[in-house]
Amino acid sequence: DLYWEVIEVPTEDLKSKDSYYSFHLPDEVNRVKGVTAIILKETPDEKELPEIEKREGKNWIGLRIRNKGKITDIYINQLADGRLMHSNSWIEADGWSTDAYMFIVTYPEKSAPADAKEYFIGYGSSLKRGTTSYFSSLAKLFIIQKEENRRMQLWIDGSTKVKAYIRSLQCPVSVSVNGESIPIVYDHSNLKIEL
């Protein structure tokens, strides 16, 4: 039977936790191609709901969500689902290159994706746009990055030791990882993270 479990994840502002439902299929399957979005209204009268557009490209599927002046692009890498271990799982999606299973980029409606200050990288070691690196690590990690008023908040999981580089156009005035402040090591638009 189809079943679900409740999973705790960081909230959008990374200050607390929120619960989400993970649905599990009754049988093991080799490949599932699909994205499901369930949007619940805050009130019965709510009329302004997100606009969702289905998207796909070579070896990826995704969504573009427009809501309250922001665009969120969601990409699922169909080569990085765990079946191709030790194989190349790189994709090119809308100018981004990555080996991540999933990545999400959020940016204001009137700006370009390259100017985004919010990212999610799900089990990846690199995110690039052209020759510009936005994230680089020797280990595949889970990362949430949110930058506002030159304050960088990160949530990182996936390895006990982390050495990563994250793009930031200006040197942040503060950096926190998983709620803890860390020293700022910044050089040429790159923030070095060592845990």
In which residue ranges do the predicted regions lie?
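CBM-like, beta-strand-rich accessory domains located in the C-terminal region of large
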Residues: 1-173, 177-195
